[in-house]
């Protein structure tokens, strides 16, 4: 259902269209269960089962720390998908790990995330957050959200949502979506700025893809990791 169409209006539209099918569509022949859904931030969230952790618990740090950015009018300005030749867990656990960024991406994302000495960590049972001061003022937030989401926020209101979606034992889909404040998302200057923003993030993600795919090859080679550092 379109997020801008109310339930009653959607029912009326569906009923009118069903009569035009050949043969006529009979809804009782397709007993589809209803799924709970709700809008929160720029997204519509759908629960595929009743036994889910409440959305408030999944997003509690987002609501606490960046509520103004999260609830402002936003437009999705870019979307990109690519296949990673590694399983989703390797990609998810390494892509935005804070110290990994500092070591592996010194000339890309680390320039925005800032020096390690300024790292401030926050966590709940489900969510982790890294907060660093941004060079342009305000704070840069990097969230890890269940089950395979990463959210990055810039102090002026831009958001990047990175999803690592499972495909097979040794591949996954990386989806990047960029959101900008609605008041500043139109026109040629905004389009050029969004292209530059996407280019910057892709430089980081190109580096990251090489790293996580090499980790997958290492595990497949029979590598046995050593003990954790004490």
Protein language model features and the residues they cover:
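C-terminal catalytic domain of Rieske-type non-heme iron oxygenases
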Residues: 35-39, 43-230
